[in-house]
Amino acid sequence: YIYGLVADIADGMGLKFLGFDISGMEGMAVRGDLPENPLDPASDKKGLQIRTTGSPMPKALMTALGYTPVTVEWNEVYSATQSGMINGFLGANAGSAYNQFRDIINYYLPIGFAVDSNRIVVSGKFWDTMTAEQQDAFATYAKEIFDESIAQTKVEEQDYMDKLEAAGVEVIDMEQADYDALAQIARDNCWPLLIDTYGQDVYDEMMAFYSK
């Protein structure tokens, strides 16, 4: 469904969308003590302030989980975390958590809030000048990039989580039930915010598709 939605948006911009190049899944990092049951909305989060972007989506998720969301620019996250201005942050995949923050964080939760990815696009006008054979070649290559990026990301994410553990950062194990519970929290609290941007019809279609 998301592929089709992005393709429609790209088409409206005069672009031909061919696929995604995945680079990681965004998690949550915490400095200091981690609350008991950190992903249970009912547990006491002790007023922990977690950095998010200015987007209402991550703010809604953190609020639903019981944290206090704080907007901090990405280039200020390190100093804000180190100084105690914030207690943690949302938005780093495992590689980023290791490479940029391993010396100041104590916990990493691979919650998979969002996918870090690049979009593979070409000019719509250029696409229309191609033969069917050339278009097929581009589409095939884009699919290969997508498939390879998924496989590579799985390996790299695990490798970086192992490195985080070796560096003294505790990576919180998550079961499928944890991801299912988070997904439901997101559907209830974050997805309705999409209506203002994409409209009621898109929201209804998403809910129907992902509720199957």
Outline where the language-model segments fall.
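A gly/proline- and charged-residue-enriched helix-loop-helix capping module
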Residues: 1-12
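N-terminal secretory/targeting leader peptides
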Residues: 13-212
